[in-house]
């Protein structure tokens, strides 16, 4: 009886196997793309209110460290983010801390500095020789900062910038701003009356929401006027205040003076990494504020209109593709425990070629920030101040010398008496 198998005999199987091997060897296997550089921009964790309001029964003393300080909840949020980053970049970053691979910069504010510390504790728990005390699963890792008054990279809005101030004045005359002011005029007045604030505007009301939000989060009682409807309106106005800062009117012009400054630095860092000029640096982290993320995302035109939550993180990943070209992928992590969601630059795919990424962002990059900000008429450099001081001293010396010379010259009497007898008139001489 004939065998019904279609596999054939042994020699035939060997021939088929050989053909399969030859076929796959002729088609090169795709190489995996390589992650080359990562930039993180994250907001600090949960904090106490930045300000109170006059009628608030919960004064600053109820917060263990006072206003604007990171809480234990915020510390845990950033430790969690550090753990998530450790898992995400396993195989890219060294398992243990390597100072050549990572650089962290923070604004010079307690809550951002402490958030960076908590983040690094989660990212790099000490291992082996890095353990200096077996009872402490932590190691010191440097965080760099500069004074707030000098920070023109992470502290927004950047000032002084007269051109930006002018744009904000124009924004207040925009239809959207006027409409919001008209719509919420009575509401803002009610909030002012209830809080005891003398001035409550679209630009300042965010602080009222912030205080109530922090108190609610930490289980403090809220005033009876702070109903769900009131909180909802305050939340909406708070979100508008962020858009007002960097959008609403002339978004691109504002970006050139604000968020574009940070974008420009991020692009320079990625370009250096693509050109193997980053000296082994793999990850650069910026610890900052919701206003930093707002300025950044509105400059990129990817802002979702909502205030960035605590410990949220905007991620830039630079990849080297099989072709040798580089691409940039962005992600936004805005919820703990959730995978960061992809963010695409308008006009480009999610994996955006680096050259296209740079080209699309050129309109928001200032060629000469000080000139565009018109700071030359506003800020005097140290050299200018020294020059003016020397000039003033020289002028003073010249005036003193001239006065002394004038005093030493012979003087004519201002009045002369006529000695004619019988004439008692005093004749006044001319003072020449």
Swiss-Prot record:
Name of the protein in question: Lysosomal acid phosphatase
Transmembrane segments: 385-405
GO MF annotations in UniProt: acid phosphatase activity
InterPro entries per record: Acid_Pase_AS, His_Pase_clade-2, His_PPase_superfam, Histidine_acid_phosphatase
Residue positions with a glycan: 94, 135, 179, 193, 269, 325, 334
Pfam family, one: His_Phos_2
Matching CDD domains: HP_HAP_like
Source taxonomy: Eukaryota, Metazoa, Chordata, Craniata, Vertebrata
């Amino acid at each position: 009886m004939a065998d019904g198998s279609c596999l054939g005999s042994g020699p035939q199987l060997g021939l088929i196997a050989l053909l399969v091997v030859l076929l796959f060897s002729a088609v090169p296997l795709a190489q995996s793309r390589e992650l080359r550089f990562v930039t993180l921009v994250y907001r600090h964790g949960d904090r106490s209110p930045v300000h109170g309001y006059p009628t608030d029964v919960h004064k600053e003393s109820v917060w263990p460290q006072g206003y604007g300080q990171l809480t234990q909840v915020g510390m845990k949020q950033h430790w969690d983010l550090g753990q998530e980053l450790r898992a995400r970049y396993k195989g890219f970053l060294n398992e243990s801390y390597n100072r050549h691979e990572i650089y962290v910069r923070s604004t010079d504010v307690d809550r951002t500095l402490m958030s960076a510390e908590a983040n690094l504790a989660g990212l790099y728990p000490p291992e082996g020789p890095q353990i200096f005390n077996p009872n402490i699963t932590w190691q010191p890792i440097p965080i760099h900062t500069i004074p707030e008054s000098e920070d023109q990279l992470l502290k927004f809005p950047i000032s002084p910038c007269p051109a930006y101030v002018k744009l904000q004045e124009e924004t207040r005359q925009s239809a959207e701003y006027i409409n919001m002011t008209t719509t919420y005029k009575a509401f803002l007045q009610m909030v002012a009356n209830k809080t005891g604030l003398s001035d409550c505007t679209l630009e300042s009301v965010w602080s009222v929401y912030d205080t109530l939000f922090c108190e609610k989060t930490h289980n403090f009682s809220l005033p009876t006027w702070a109903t769900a409807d009131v909180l909802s309106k305050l939340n909406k106005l708070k979100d508008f205040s962020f858009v007002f800062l960097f959008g609403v009117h002339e978004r691109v012009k504002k970006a050139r003076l604000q968020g574009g400054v940070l974008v420009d630095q991020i692009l320079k860092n990625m370009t250096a990494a693509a050109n193997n000029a980053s000296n082994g640096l793999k990850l650069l982290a910026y610890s900052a504020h919701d206003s930093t993320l707002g300025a950044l995302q509105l400059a990129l035109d990817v802002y979702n209109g909502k205030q960035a939550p605590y410990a949220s993180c905007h991620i830039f990943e630079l990849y080297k593709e099989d072709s040798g070209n580089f691409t940039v992928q962005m992600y936004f992590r805005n919820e703990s425990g959730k995978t960061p969601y992809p963010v695409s630059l308008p006009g480009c795919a999610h994996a955006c070629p680096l050259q296209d990424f740079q080209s699309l962002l050129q309109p928001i990059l200032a060629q000469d920030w000080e000139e565009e900000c018109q700071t030359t008429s506003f800020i005097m450099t140290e050299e200018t101040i020294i020059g003016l001081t020397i000039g003033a001293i020289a002028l003073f010396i010249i005036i003193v010398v001239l006065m002394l010379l004038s005093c030493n010259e012979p003087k004519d009497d201002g009045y002369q008496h006529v000695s004619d007898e019988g004439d008692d008139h005093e004749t006044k001489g001319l003072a020449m």
